[in-house]
Amino acid sequence: IAADHFLAYRQSTGLMTVLAGLPWFTDWGRDTMIALTGLTLSTGRYQDARDILTTFARYIHHGMVPNMFPDEGTDPLYNTADASMWYFYAVGKYLDYTGTPEDYSFVQETIYPKLKEIIAAYEHGTDFSIYMEEDGLIHAGSGLDQVTWMDVRVGDWVATPRHGKP
């Protein structure tokens, strides 16, 4: 199956992960959460999906799902405004596909506290000037860091500025 080429065992976490596009990209939070349904759930790989959700839950920091895990095994990077929101989507899809009492317990015990942490961090403001405004929309960065999927930057020049509420 083609999905096999995107799933890999990450030695540093001891669990499965999604590779966004080797050799250029390893595991990226946004890409992983978007692809989780097609690569694991629709193919019946429920344990792989659970492992991936667990890995990203372990690394949530200041309410932010990692943007990427560097190849070198160093600390994850967190410069993304939307990976945490895609995480909610992936958890919902996981329950849609599995739905057993055991799966609900897993989410209740392992994932739900992290979802609450994400909401609280966005409400109060987190790293990279990411926060929820009074209207409920997300403010995505100050312009100093590129925190959306359109993140091209060459020196001080930003090809597609997307800060604020783009």
Language model features with spans:
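Acidic, mature catalytic/reactive cores of soluble proteins
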Residues: 1-166
